[in-house]
Structures are given as structure tokens and as C-alpha cells.
């Protein structure tokens, strides 16, 4: 039995995005984020490796990590947020774990992820 009220479930189902591509930890993705600067809005791309996914319906989120000027940057995005314009998968990674937090300690060639073939 579900712990959420039926009305709440229906409201959440309306807000779910339908155009979210299938991606998993280890994949390299480009996330287009809406950024508001003053009175104008633009898209900003954030490209990196998905190190974690959290699947909770409307509260689903994923964490993307990239190295910018030698410094590791991680951003967590809400999958169904209006701020996230699009998610594009650039390359599929071949990993065995669901959470890739160990990449935080690795640098350079050690932090590379094998590409999934086939």
C-alpha cells in the first residue's frame, strides 16, 4: 500500500517530465540548465559524468561531476525540475556500481571510465 495520498499521486504524475532520456551512473551527459541573469534567461550547459542517481518519482535526482580547471565540481539536479531544460547522453560508461563516489579521490587517467560497447 502506498503511503502517499491518491490526490497527491495524481498531482505528481502531472508534473513528471516525459522527455527524460535513459541514463545511468558512469554515463557522460550534457545538462542544459536555465539560468536567470537579471531580467533575461539563458541556457547553460553542464557536462560531466553521472556519479549517482536517486529514483523517487517526482523527487528523482542525479549528481553530475566534472573537472573544471583542475578542480572537481559536482552538481545535483532534480530530474523533473523546470530549471533543467534537457539532458543529452554523450557517451555510455561501463561501471559496476550504482554510486561512483570513489571518483572523488581519483585524478587524471585513474578517473577515466571505460566506454560501454554494444
UniProtKB/Swiss-Prot annotation:
Q: Does the keyword Ribonucleoprotein apply?
A: yes
| Pfam families according to UniProt | Ribosomal_L19
Source superkingdom: Bacteria
Q: Name one GO cellular component term.
A: cytosolic large ribosomal subunit
Q: Which GO terms describe its molecular function?
A: structural constituent of ribosome
Q: Which InterPro entries match?
A: Ribosomal_bL19, Ribosomal_bL19_CS, Ribosomal_bL19_sf, Translation_prot_SH3-like_sf
Q: Name one GO biological process term.
A: translation
Among PROSITE patterns, the record links this protein to: RIBOSOMAL_L19
Which keywords does this chain's UniProt record carry? Ribonucleoprotein, Ribosomal protein
PANTHER family reported for this sequence: LARGE RIBOSOMAL SUBUNIT PROTEIN BL19M, RIBOSOMAL PROTEIN L19
Query: Which family is it part of?
Result: Belongs to the bacterial ribosomal protein bL19 family.
* Function of the protein: This protein is located at the 30S-50S ribosomal subunit interface and may play a role in the structure and function of the aminoacyl-tRNA binding site.
| NCBIfam families cross-referenced by the UniProt entry | rplS_bact
What name does the UniProt record give this protein? Large ribosomal subunit protein bL19
Q: Which organism is this protein's natural source? A: Saccharophagus degradans (strain 2-40 / ATCC 43961 / DSM 17024)
Q: Give the gene that encodes this protein.
A: rplS
Amino acid at each position: 500500500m502506498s503511503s502517499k495520498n491518491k490526490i497527491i499521486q495524481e498531482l505528481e504524475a502531472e508534473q513528471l517530465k516525459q522527455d527524460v532520456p535513459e541514463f545511468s551512473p558512469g554515463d557522460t551527459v550534457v545538462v542544459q540548465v536555465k539560468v536567470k541573469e537579471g531580467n533575461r534567461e539563458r541556457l547553460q550547459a553542464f557536462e560531466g559524468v553521472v556519479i549517482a542517481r536517486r529514483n523517487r518519482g517526482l523527487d528523482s535526482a542525479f549528481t553530475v561531476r566534472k573537472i573544471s580547471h583542475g578542480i572537481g565540481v559536482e552538481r545535483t539536479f532534480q530530474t523533473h525540475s523546470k530549471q533543467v531544460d534537457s539532458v543529452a547522453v554523450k557517451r555510455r560508461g561501463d561501471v559496476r556500481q550504482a554510486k561512483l563516489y570513489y571518483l572523488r579521490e581519483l585524478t587524471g587517467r585513474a578517473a577515466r571510465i571505460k566506454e560501454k560497447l554494444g
